[in-house]
From Swiss-Prot:
Protein name: Ribosome-recycling factor
Keywords in alphabetical order: Cytoplasm, Protein biosynthesis
Organism listed in the record: Aliarcobacter butzleri (strain RM4018)
Name of one Pfam family that matches: RRF
InterPro entries xrefs: Ribosome_recyc_fac (IPR002661), Ribosome_recyc_fac_dom (IPR023584), RRF_sf (IPR036191)
Record's function text: Responsible for the release of ribosomes from messenger RNA at the termination of protein biosynthesis. May increase the efficiency of translation by recycling ribosomes from one round of translation to another.
Lineage: Bacteria, Pseudomonadati, Campylobacterota, Epsilonproteobacteria, Campylobacterales
Cellular component terms per the entry's GO annotation: cytosol
Subcellular location: Cytoplasm
Top-rank taxon, per record: Bacteria
Family recorded in the similarity comment: Belongs to the RRF family.
Length: 185
């Protein structure tokens, strides 16, 4: 029973770390990443479709992303979707492809992005602690139902705390790596 609680705790906490890493992909670092366009939807014949599904999206260099739509009549629609997404760049439509030129990040922008990464990490830590609380509640329920003893309950809560500490540390290490990536010029 307790092994199942531990396994579920680890699984949910791992998902929190994966969600944090996915959130980090939306942050701009020193070089552009096509993930900044994730979530932008284009009206494709009446259906809202991911931008990546209507053309090829490539980072051609450290400051440029090019979008080559499968159908040229989508250029205007894609351009409008990018403008509405408020990602901090204006699309450049040359009639064949759309280019997005990202200016180099200033020190202030880098620091602001690093702060945003810290906020994301703090939210992940809150999620991890909530998972700990849910797991501890499961242990208390097992104790109340007399499925485990008082000593087993205490040991289980200690083990859950160890698991929590390891995932909080993992979140901090992930943040350190991301901050280094963001702040490196």
């Amino acid at each position: 029973m307790l092994q199942e609680v531990y396994a579920q705790t680890k699984e949910h906490m791992e998902k929190s770390i994966e969600a944090l890493k996915k959130d980090y992909k939306s942050l701009r670092t020193g070089k552009v990443n096509t993930n900044i366009l994730d979530g932008i939807k284009v009206d494709y014949y009446g259906t809202m479709t991911d931008l990546s599904q209507v053309g090829s999206v490539l980072a051609t260099d450290a400051t440029t992303i090019t979008i080559n739509p499968w159908e040229k009549n989508l250029l205007g629609t894609i351009e409008k979707a990018i403008q509405n997404a408020n990602i901090g760049v204006n699309p450049n439509n040359d009639g064949q492809i759309i280019k997005l030129f990202f200016p180099p990040m200033t020190v202030e922008q880098r620091q602001e992005t690093a702060k945003h990464a810290k906020t994301m990490t703090d939210n992940a830590k809150v999620a991890i602690r909530n998972i700990r609380q849910n797991s501890n509640n499961k242990v208390k329920t097992l104790l109340k139902d007399k499925a485990i003893t008082e000593d087993e309950s205490k040991k289980a809560q200690d083990e859950i705390q160890k698991i929590t500490d390891s995932y909080v540390l993992k979140a901090d290490e992930t943040l350190k790596a991301k901050e280094k990536e963001i702040l490196t010029v």
